[in-house]
């Protein structure tokens, strides 16, 4: 992890080049190991005002199964220190973990809620291709068990004053994550640094960009060419509707229908077939001025999004 001094230099360099808003959200992601937690005071002094902690679970056996280097007590320690130094703190929790019981999932959520952080992300474990779990699948809870875990913990979140504003994101009033809202509204963002991705809209096209992934290669490219791009792909008109829906349908409030044309440059009728089918299946809200998933649509989000392929 970058040192506090390095973070200070980085943010000073950004401020010297970009006119940041006074209330700009400046987020850092961190693992809850004790060494990193002790650095939080320095990061806050450098200008970080929001930290996202990859807790995943407070159960030592679950953390070990996930290959995490921290344990439950270190996670609690990191949260306590983060709350002392940062305006906003997010906790990442996972469910549907190997051999996870309803009781263990409830315990994880109750511990997380006891810290009263402004924001909480609650993800279902997915087995990504080319990972250890994909090659050697563990025993996971059944679909019914996963549904029970989700419904149980959703009630706990709502009772604690959190609102679900995205399929996996929950926040106290006015504590939604600004940069993630921008992604989910199909907004633009600049990728700076090794491995960074960006999305940029031009008057006649929208491109996705990728930078050199290895830090040393990235720095060499910047020094010799002033540019470390390894890919700048234009999103085709055929793919734009799906990419838009892939992001915006994650939001529980959805977006206004006019946003589709504003962000894609395409008329809404190019997705009329998908909209009709989604409405018939009860996956899309019938409000003609909104593109918004129903509760059923959020539950079967992949099925809803695939209608726009």
Regions found by a protein language model. Give the residues of each.
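Short, amphipathic alpha-helical interaction segments positioned at domain boundaries
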Residues: 296-309
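Short amphipathic alpha-helical interaction segments
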Residues: 265-277
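A short, conserved structural fragment
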Residues: 279-289
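C-terminal scaffold of the Radical SAM
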Residues: 1-266
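Generic N-terminal initiation segments characterized by hydrophobic and/or small/turn-forming residues
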Residues: 110, 272, 281, 298-301
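Minor-groove-contacting beta-hairpin "wing" of winged helix-turn-helix DNA-binding domains
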Residues: 290-294
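Short, ordered coil/turn segments that flank beta-strands lining enzyme active or ligand-binding pockets
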Residues: 185, 280, 295
């Amino acid at each position: 992890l970058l040192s506090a001094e390095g973070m200070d230099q980085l943010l000073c360099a950004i401020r010297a080049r970009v006119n940041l808003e006074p209330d700009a959200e400046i987020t850092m992601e961190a693992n809850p190991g004790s060494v990193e937690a002790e650095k939080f005071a320095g990061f806050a002094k450098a200008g970080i005002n929001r930290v996202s902690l990859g807790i995943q679970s407070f159960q030592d056996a679950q953390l070990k199964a996930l290959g995490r280097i921290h344990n439950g007590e270190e996670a609690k320690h990191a949260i306590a220190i983060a709350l002392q130094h940062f305006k906003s703190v997010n906790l990442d929790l996972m469910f549907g973990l190997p051999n996870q019981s309803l009781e263990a999932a409830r315990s994880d959520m109750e511990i997380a809620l006891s810290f009263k952080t402004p924001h909480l992300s609650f993800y279902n474990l997915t087995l990504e291709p080319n990972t250890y779990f994909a090659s050697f699948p563990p025993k996971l809870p059944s679909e019914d068990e996963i549904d029970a875990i989700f419904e149980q913990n959703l009630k706990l979140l709502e009772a604690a004053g959190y609102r679900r504003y995205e399929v996996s994101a929950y926040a106290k009033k006015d504590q939604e994550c600004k940069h993630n809202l921008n992604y989910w509204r199909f907004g633009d963002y600049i990728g700076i640094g090794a491995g960074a991705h960006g999305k940029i809209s031009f008057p006649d096209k929208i491109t996705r960009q990728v930078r050199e992934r290895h830090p040393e290669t990235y720095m060499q490219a910047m020094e010799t060419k002033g540019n470390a791009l390894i890919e700048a792909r234009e999103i085709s008109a055929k793919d734009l509707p799906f990419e838009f829906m892939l992001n915006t349908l994650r939001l529980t409030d959805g977006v206004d229908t006019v946003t589709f044309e504003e962000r894609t440059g395409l008329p809404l009728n190019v997705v009329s077939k998908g909209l009709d089918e989604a409405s018939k299946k009860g996956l899309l809200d019938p409000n003609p001025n909104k593109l918004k998933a129903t509760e059923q649509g959020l539950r079967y989000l992949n099925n809803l999004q695939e209608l726009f392929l």
